[in-house]
């Protein structure tokens, strides 16, 4: 029985990056032996065990064979006869197919160390093309390691293109796809994730509404980058640089999908793209099974982001309606995320990344001014129900008028 450290822990140590979790592979052992040693079984599909003291995952060395479509279409074989090299060759990328023995010696049968040095993400074997989830995984790794200069090997991109063209991506479950998409959007370069998916044709299969934005022009006076798809990539990059949460990044990815519906004869203007895009955003949320906070914010940002940009021009009554639409008096954080998404949208324009966005402070200040209106005096007057709500709205509107007079340019 031999135990090896494998995968990401080995890769990140060689890159000098912090190691967050460690995976192990066990060669020459059976499931029965693992149980006798006190390991706890957790693998539903193949033998994976938790160490009785550390809780780290130990998997029996295994091989796999394609037996159906999609991520789950594999038959696994684990036995004491499976070698370390046989286990490593089933992995996706050479940089993930390295191991260390208990003395710290590196085992690298597939050139992972060489590819690390060359900053290349390269598949281990042609079996890569059997698992459609690997398209998303490789794009996610590209998003993670782009700041270090990594890129996807041309031949690997070719296999990813084959997978996209084969229709295999349609067999991925929404849950698996969302897990990869959400993790990728939180990487240092989420824009690279989208670009790699587009380069291999997978974006058209997974998020066709976003893919349709590339090549759609916008007015150069407002968008020096012109191309709507390029703008979305820039907005995502701003999200990462400003450490925005997943909900904001998801909303920013989808905020302009309505522009893909504009007839070419109307380009580069996109009248009412906010409302046109809502049905697309709703369909994407449902198809991807986006969690509620992400789905709700995406819909709200899609509908109201131009309100955010015109905040200083909004009438106090319109501003109050906006605050009410966001339920800001009970959910102030959601409105703060909306404001952040608007700012990322404004900064995601080529050459304007550092331009000030006074709308952000103005909107947050307006929300606070309305929130500060006390309810107690109205209750003391005996108001309740609809009467109380109307009186509270009048007081909030009065507060917003005073706020606008003080803070908005005349």
From Swiss-Prot:
GO BP terms: RNA repair; tRNA 3'-terminal CCA addition
EC numbers on record: 2.7.7.72, 3.1.3.-, 3.1.4.-
The keyword Iron appears for this protein: no
Chain positions recorded as ATP binding sites: 8, 11, 91, 137, 140
Catalytic activity: a tRNA precursor + 2 CTP + ATP = a tRNA with a 3' CCA end + 3 diphosphate; a tRNA with a 3' CCA end + 2 CTP + ATP = a tRNA with a 3' CCACCA end + 3 diphosphate
PROSITE patterns: HD
GO molecular function, one term: CCA tRNA nucleotidyltransferase activity
Residue ranges constituting the HD domain according to the UniProt record: 228-329
Transmembrane segments: none
Cystine crosslinks: none
Cofactor note: Magnesium is required for nucleotidyltransferase activity. Nickel for phosphatase activity.
Cofactors, names only: Mg(2+); Ni(2+)
Keywords for the protein's UniProt record, in alphabetical order: ATP-binding, Hydrolase, Magnesium, Metal-binding, Multifunctional enzyme, Nickel, Nucleotide-binding, Nucleotidyltransferase, RNA repair, RNA-binding, Transferase, tRNA processing
Domain of life where this protein originates: Bacteria
Annotated binding of CTP, by residue: 8, 11, 91, 137, 140
Entry binding sites for Mg(2+): 21, 23
InterPro entries the record matches: CCA_bact (IPR012006), HD/PDEase_dom (IPR003607), HD_domain (IPR006674), NT_sf (IPR043519), PolA_pol_head_dom (IPR002646), PolyA_RNA-bd (IPR032828), tRNA_CCA-adding_enzyme (IPR050124)
Quaternary assembly: Monomer. Can also form homodimers and oligomers.
Family: Belongs to the tRNA nucleotidyltransferase/poly(A) polymerase family. Bacterial CCA-adding enzyme type 1 subfamily.
Comment field (misc): A single active site specifically recognizes both ATP and CTP and is responsible for their addition.
PANTHER family for this protein: MULTIFUNCTIONAL CCA PROTEIN
Protein function: Catalyzes the addition and repair of the essential 3'-terminal CCA sequence in tRNAs without using a nucleic acid template. Adds these three nucleotides in the order of C, C, and A to the tRNA nucleotide-73, using CTP and ATP as substrates and producing inorganic pyrophosphate. tRNA 3'-terminal CCA addition is required both for tRNA processing and repair. Also involved in tRNA surveillance by mediating tandem CCA addition to generate a CCACCA at the 3' terminus of unstable tRNAs. While stable tRNAs receive only 3'-terminal CCA, unstable tRNAs are marked with CCACCA and rapidly degraded.
Domain comment in the entry: Comprises two domains: an N-terminal domain containing the nucleotidyltransferase activity and a C-terminal HD domain associated with both phosphodiesterase and phosphatase activities.
Protein name: Multifunctional CCA protein
UniProt lineage: Bacteria, Pseudomonadati, Pseudomonadota, Gammaproteobacteria, Pseudomonadales
Protein encoded by which gene: cca
């Amino acid at each position: 029985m031999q135990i090896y450290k494998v995968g990401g822990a080995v890769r990140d140590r060689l890159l000098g990056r912090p190691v967050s979790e460690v995976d192990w592979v066990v060669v020459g052992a059976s499931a029965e032996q693992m149980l006798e040693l006190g390991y706890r079984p957790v693998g539903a599909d193949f033998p994976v065990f938790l160490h009785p003291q550390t809780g780290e995952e130990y998997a029996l060395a295994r091989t796999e064979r394609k037996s159906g479509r999609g991520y789950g279409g594999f038959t696994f074989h684990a036995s004491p006869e499976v070698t370390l090299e046989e286990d490593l060759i089933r992995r996706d990328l050479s940089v993930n197919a390295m191991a260390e023995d208990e003395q710290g010696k590196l085992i690298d049968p597939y050139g992972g160390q060489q590819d690390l040095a060359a900053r290349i993400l390269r598949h281990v074997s042609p079996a890569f093309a059997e698992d459609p989830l690997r398209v998303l995984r490789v794009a996610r790794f590209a998003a993670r390691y782009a700041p270090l200069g990594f890129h996807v090997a041309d031949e690997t991109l070719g296999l990813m293109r084959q997978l996209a063209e084969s229709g295999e991506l349609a067999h991925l479950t929404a849950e698996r796809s969302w897990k990869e998409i959400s993790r990728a959007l939180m990487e240092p370069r989420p824009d690279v994730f989208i670009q790699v998916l587009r380069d291999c044709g997978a974006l058209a299969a997974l998020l066709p509404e976003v893919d349709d934005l590339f090549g759609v022009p916008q007015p150069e006076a407002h968008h020096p980058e012109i191309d709507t798809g390029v703008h979305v990539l820039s907005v995502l990059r701003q999200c990462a640089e400003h450490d925005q949460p997943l909900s904001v990044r998801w909303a920013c990815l989808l905020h302009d999908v309505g522009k893909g519906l504009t007839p070419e004869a109307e380009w580069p203007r996109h009248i009412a793209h906010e409302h046109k895009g809502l049905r697309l955003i709703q369909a994407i949320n449902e198809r991807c099974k986006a969690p509620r906070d992400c789905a709700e914010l995406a819909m709200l940002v899609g509908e109201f982001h131009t309100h955010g940009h015109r905040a200083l021009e909004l009438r106090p009554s319109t501003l109050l309606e906006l605050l009410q639409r966001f339920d800001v008096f009970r959910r102030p954080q959601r409105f703060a995320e909306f404001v952040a998404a608007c700012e990322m949208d404004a900064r995601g324009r080529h050459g304007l990344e550092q331009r000030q966005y006074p709308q952000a402070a103005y909107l947050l200040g307006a929300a606070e001014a309305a929130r500060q209106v006390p309810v107690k005096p109205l209750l003391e007057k005996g108001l309740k129900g609809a009467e109380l709500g109307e009186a509270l709205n009048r007081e909030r509107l009065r507060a917003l008028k005073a706020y606008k007079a003080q803070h908005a340019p005349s």
